[in-house]
Amino acid sequence: QFAFYLGYGIMAIPAAIFIRIYSYKAGILLGLGLYAVGASLFIPASIYQEFYFFLGALCVLTCGLALLEVTANPYVLSMGHPDTATRRLNLAQAFNPMGSLTGMFIASSVILNKLQVEAFRNEERLAHPEYNDMLPSVVDGHLTQALSDFATNEPIAHQAMQAADLVTVRGPYVAIAIIASVLFFVYLFSKLPKTMSHDHPLTIGELKDTFGRLIRNQRYVEGVIAQAFYVGAQIMVWTFVIHYGMMAIGLTAAEAQGYNIIAMMIFLSSRFICTFLLGFFRPGQLLMLLAIGAIVLTLGAIFLQGFAGLYSLIGISACMSLMYPTIYGIALKDMGDD
């Protein structure tokens, strides 16, 4: 998780400077290039079975993702009338969860069911019926210890298991690298609308002036703070769905992933619903209402037990659907090239 989000942390500001100096198209091309390279690095990483190689590949991949997000979101805002910019970004962002859903479906139906380590854990459960009377978190500890003992006592068999699982995991990254490479050439030879007003490379002085204006813009600063809290909450909610299902209810990894897919489907459908509602509500009003709903559901996830708590946790996704693009749109309203 740290390596994944490190790419966003180290690339976001350089990406913004890059597209400010050059163009949105240049940002898209560089982002797709890094995305393809990062995904391709998973091939040698799986061959050499080096953990830090995987972390490096993941960081490069997310640097590409950061460039794509930093480029695409303000580009969408700039492509039309300012009054409908936030609604336009919500519509564009509604297609984002489709990729997440596809990835979750592949992980649940193709990857998890083929992983030998998951088969090992299931065999351990069957061999120890007493686990049925234990807390899921305790069972998970026993299964992790059993896997560690297996690695110690039968290192060759454990290494073969790892190698087989890495081949299974590698496939989707190869597909990502191919798709990103194809898109790179599609955008390379496409003519995109120009929305920036400057027609020359920006100087260091002009960039300093831009940062100065941003720091003095109260709405922008508050938007950055709000977005930081939102993204932190989103990561925690979506990461915790699987852990909650496995540790608090006792679901298998594949079953818990199924509930994660449900959360993403709710998130996806709510994005389209909220895009429609923005035709009748001001962005700030709708954002406030859904924030209140998210608070109520968060309290439910904290204090309710079993499936009621899980359903509350999943329901938060409906409220989160509006937040990222709407906070983004409100914070960047009337910003111009900045």
Predicted features along the sequence, with ranges:
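Central cavity-lining transmembrane alpha-helices of secondary-active solute carriers
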Residues: 2-20, 261-274
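C-terminal ends and interior cores of transmembrane alpha-helices
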Residues: 33-48, 292-306
